[in-house]
Amino acid sequence: MKGPCKLEQLLPAPLKNKAVAVAAACLLAAGSVFGVGGAKLAAYESSTAAAFSDGMYSIAADLDARLNSAANLTTVAGKVSGVSAETIDGVNSAIGAVNAAEGPAAKAAADAQLDAAVNALYDEAVKLADTNQYDLLAGELAEFNARGNTIRNNDYNSRAQEFNDTLSGQPAKLIGALWGIEEAEYYR
C-alpha cells in the first residue's frame, strides 16, 4: 500500500488515526441525517399545515366563506317576523365558536355545531318567510352547504395522513422527536 496522500498529510495528528477518522465520519453522517432530515421534516410539517390554512382553496378559506353565509342568513332571518332571537343567537354563538377554535380538529367540531344551528335557524325562518325572504334564505343556505361540501372534499385530511405516516416511520419518528415535530391534526 502506498503512503498517505498529500491531503492526509495535512490532517491534524488526531485525525490521522483511523479510529478517530471513522468516528468523525460517523458523527458527520449522523449530524447530516438529523440536521438535514429534521429541516426537511419541519418543512413538510409546515407545508401540511399550510394546506389547511393558506390560499383560496384551503379549508380555512372555505370556512370563512361558510361563516359569511351563516352571518348573512342570520341577517335575513332577523328580518323575518316571528323568528326567535334565541335561534339567531345560537347561530351567532356558533360563528364565534368557529372563530375561537384553534386547530383543525377544534374547527371541525365547532363547524359541526354551526351546521346544526344554521339548519335549525333555516327550518324556523323558512316557515315564516314571504317569497322574497324565502329566496334569500334558500340562497344563503345553498352557499353555506356548498362550502361545507367543498370542505368535506378537500384533500387536507389525506395530506395530513401522508405526513403522519411519514412521521411514524424510522428515522423520521426519532428526528421528529428531536425537532419537536408532532402529528398533523385531522379536520374531522
Where are these regions (language model features)?
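A helix-centric hydrophobic-segment signal that preferentially recognizes long
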Residues: 1-188
